[in-house]
Amino acid sequence: MSEKRILIFYGTRYGATEGVAGRMAEILRENGNQVEIFNLKDLPDDKIPEFSNYDGIIIGSSIKIGQWTRDVKKFVGNYSKKLNEFKGKLGFYVCSGYASDPDNYEKVKIDYTQKACEKLGVKKLDLYDAFGGLMDFTETSRMGWLEKRILKTVGQMTTGEKAEDNSYHDLRDWNQIEKFTLEFNKRL
C-alpha cells in the first residue's frame, strides 16, 4: 500500500478534540501515511492547503450547547463546495460529553455530524462518529469558573453524582477512536 496524504482540521475548546486529532494523526502515521494537522483557530484562509493534493480529510469539532466551534462552522460553510467535490475520503467527528452516554450516542452522532454538515451544504461524508469529551475541573483547565459550575450542576442532575473540585474525567473512548481511524485508513 502506498503512502497516502491526509489533512486533519479541528476546532477545540477544552482540548478533547485536539487530543483526538493528535491521536488520529499518530495512528495514521503508524500506518505509513503522511499527515498534516491544523487547529482551524490558528489557520488563516490563505494558508489552507489545496484539498486536491490529498487522499483524505478528517474534520473534528467540539460541541458546546449543541454547537460546533465557530472556526469549524465557518470552515465547513466556506469550503462546502470544495469538500463535496473532493475526490478523496472525507471523515468527520465531534467530541461531546453527551456522546459518552449510550442513550444519547446515536442522536449525537447523527445530529452533530451528518445533519450538521448537510445544513452547511456538505453532502459527502464517507465516515463520521461522535466521541466523549473532557470534564476537567482542575486548576489548569481551559474552562472558566462559571463553565465548571454549570457542568458540575448538569452532571450531578444527570448522573446523581457530584463532581469533585480539581477532578478530571476523560470521557473519550480511545478504542472507538482507534477503530474509527483505522476504518478511515482502510477506506483511503
Description of each model-found segment:
Residues 8-29:
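Short, charged N-terminal beta->alpha structural module
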Residues 14, 43-45, 98, 136:
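Surface-exposed, flexible loop/turn segments at secondary-structure boundaries
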Residues 9-11, 38, 93, 131:
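Short hydrophobic segments within beta-strands
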Residues 46-53:
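Short amphipathic alpha-helix with an adjacent loop that forms part of the alpha/beta core around
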Residues 2-3, 19, 30-31, 53-57, ...:
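FMN-binding flavodoxin-like domain, especially the glycine-rich phosphate-binding loop
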Residues 31-44:
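A short beta-strand-loop structural module common to alpha/beta enzyme folds
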